[in-house]
Amino acid sequence: MTKIKICGITNPDDAIASCTAGADALGFNFSKASPRYIQPETALSIIEKLPPFISCVGVFVEQEPHEVNQICNLCRLDHAQLHAERYTAEKAVAVRGAKVIRVFRTGPDFTIDVVRTFAEETGITSFLFDAYRPGQPGGTGHVIEQQLAQKIFRETEHIGFGILAGGLKPENVAEATSTVRPYAVDTASGVEESPGRKNHQKIRDFVSAVHRSAELL
């Protein structure tokens, strides 16, 4: 079954709604430039009240490894999702407060060799692939072209675990999941009323669509 991450959680109601709908993981965005930014102390207060067996993921863009470690330890995060090219192999292995998910944007110069080399240098095996938009480290709301996504995830199977992101919503996630076959899918804007505020019905519809896609495999 494809795992599901609901990202951009900013309040307890959205967190619990995501969990009860069937999400496997919640994402907390610690980039101050994001409209979904959440203070670490607020994230901790939400995480402490979550039901068991939910993975908590921190989204990092501008923090140095020691800052990532501090937030991971404070918030008891399971995973650190590292965006932007600033997170070289050397910096990624310096993150020890949580397991690392490295984000790659599928721009015009992207090749799977970049992922393979990164995995060999770091031992990291979890990768999130997002659509490329100049000047945006992630959360673009744009979909990765289907043939490109299929190629990326087919090749990623031999390297680690691939997470599909970029423009996923209840209306398109079933097809994306059944054709690309990612380990997990990730959405933020696809289930929102506005940045940082979720639509609980959209969350339920998104989760149902992912589960329904299993019938198409």
Curated annotation (Swiss-Prot):
Signal peptide from the UniProt entry: none
Disulphide bond pairs: none
GO annotation terms (biological process): L-tryptophan biosynthetic process
GO molecular function: phosphoribosylanthranilate isomerase activity
Enzyme class: isomerase
Annotated EC: 5.3.1.24
Pathway noted in the entry: Amino-acid biosynthesis; L-tryptophan biosynthesis; L-tryptophan from chorismate: step 3/5
Gene3D superfamilies the UniProt entry points to: Aldolase class I
CDD domains: PRAI
Highest taxon, organism lineage: Bacteria
Keywords from the named record: Amino-acid biosynthesis, Aromatic amino acid biosynthesis, Isomerase, Tryptophan biosynthesis
Keyword Amino-acid biosynthesis: yes
Catalyzed reactions per annotation: N-(5-phospho-beta-D-ribosyl)anthranilate = 1-(2-carboxyphenylamino)-1-deoxy-D-ribulose 5-phosphate
Family: Belongs to the TrpF family.
Name the record gives this protein: N-(5'-phosphoribosyl)anthranilate isomerase
Encoding gene per record: trpF
